[in-house]
A protein has these predicted regions:
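Alpha-to-beta junction loops
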Residues: 9-13
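Conserved "HGTGT" condensation-loop signature of ketosynthase/thiolase-family condensing enzymes
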Residues: 7, 23-24, 29-51, 57-58, ...
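Conserved RecA-like P-loop NTPase ATPase core
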Residues: 2, 60
Length: 370
């Protein structure tokens, strides 16, 4: 977003990043999902779950001309990025990795590069079996012809910092370019190294120890709940990236709203009925998975698509996106989950409701159903 705003002339300098602290809510939720490893995680290895961490990562993003004019130290250039949605499951990735690969392809294409150009990838690498298997498949599918690629998961050292993970790992990627030093995935035993050598193929997974390497192009990948995928590419040089903007006129072709309409004490609440769900073929069993925030988002989204006479299919699914605005998001779900964790204990959180406490769950449900 910062890059887009700079290219549109909306500003010269933007501060971008993320921060997250360790919380009982996150611990309780991931414990309920059986996603925590009792030992330190070692992604793409023997790990059976994540290790939670906390931290913050910030990047100052600036136009080249403005940076040169003020004599700024330049670490690298942001070449391009890509995003996608699995539209598959609220917590698990698509097993075939197609959603992840879509984001990676878009990042490479927007950077005017080829897959063979990438020198280092800071992988999402959480340490859970499903995530690691899907990402391992994605990497080998797309970069099979790249004989100089290094990949690591720095979550093995920092833990999964959740909302801060993407920005922290972006900093690792930038430092890899600046220092010509690629960070490792730690936690490999001698036996683990034997297994890795049999499955790694041409990819250097940097086990246990960092090493020097000329890194001209680095990629950082983040794949989140709801099937939200993002990939970004950094470069050590200034490049002329093709301007793909078409200056097209943009129109509104579909609208919808869900609001309270009564004038009594219920005026602030939307009165949803079975008819609201039935008209879109949404089954009650599916609705029960959703918190109120997600229900409203799903129904209003489906209403707008219907009003625009758009059906999502194989021909347009990769050209259709979702942008959602919210002030409080799933706050009710967050409070309810936290109250239960406090009264019952952090080890007795609900695996059913925890996914609904993340802000991108509503968009994830809409993408899955539509």
């Amino acid at each position: 977003i910062s890059c887009d705003l700079i290219r549109e002339g909306k500003g010269d300098v933007f501060i971008a990043g993320g921060s997250d602290s360790f919380s009982s809510l996150a611990f309780s939720g991931f414990h309920a999902l059986h996603a925590l490893d009792k030992n330190a995680c070692s992604p793409f290895n023997h790990s059976t779950g994540i290790t939670l961490g906390e931290g913050s990562g910030i990047l100052v993003i600036e136009s080249y001309e403005h940076a040169v004019e003020r004599g700024a130290k330049i670490y690298c250039e942001i070449l391009g990025s890509g995003v996608s949605s699995d539209a598959y499951h609220i917590t698990a990735p698509r097993p075939d990795g197609e959603g992840q690969m879509s984001a990676i392809r878009r990042a490479v294409e927007s950077s005017a590069l080829s897959f063979d150009d990438i020198d280092y990838i800071n992988a999402h690498g959480t340490g859970t079996a499903k995530n690691d298997e899907a990402e391992f498949l994605s990497l080998h599918t797309l970069f099979d012809g790249n004989n100089h690629l290094s990949v690591s998961s720095t979550k093995s050292m920092t833990g999964h910092c959740l909302g801060a993970a993407g920005s922290i790992e972006a900093v690792f990627s930038v430092k890899a370019i600046k220092e010509n030093l690629v960070p490792p995935t730690i936690g490999y035993s001698d036996e683990d190294l034997k297994v890795l050598s049999e499955k790694a193929g041409n990819i250097d997974f940097i086990p246990n120890k960092s090493h020097t390497k000329d890194v001209h192009y680095a990629m950082s990948n983040s794949f989140a709940f709801g099937g939200n995928n993002a990939s970004i590419i950094f470069s050590d040089n200034k490049h002329d990236i093709p301007d793909n903007s078409k200056n097209e006129k943009i129109y509104i072709t579909g609208i919808s709203k869900l609001t309270g309409t009564k004038t009594d004490e219920h005026s602030l609440n939307c009165n949803l009925t079975s008819e609201d769900y039935d008209k879109h073929g949404i089954k009650v069993a599916f609705c029960r998975k959703l918190d109120r925030f997600s229900q409203l988002q799903l129904l209003s989204g489906m209403d707008a698509l219907a009003d625009a006479d758009i059906k999502i299919d194989k021909d347009n699914e990769y050209k259709t996106g979702i942008v959602i605005g919210t002030a409080d998001g799933p706050m009710t779900e967050i409070v309810d989950f936290q109250k239960k964790a406090i009264t019952r204990g952090t080890e007795k959180g609900s695996a059913f409701s925890f996914p609904n406490t993340v802000y991108n769950a509503a968009g994830g449900y809409l993408s899955i159903f539509s």
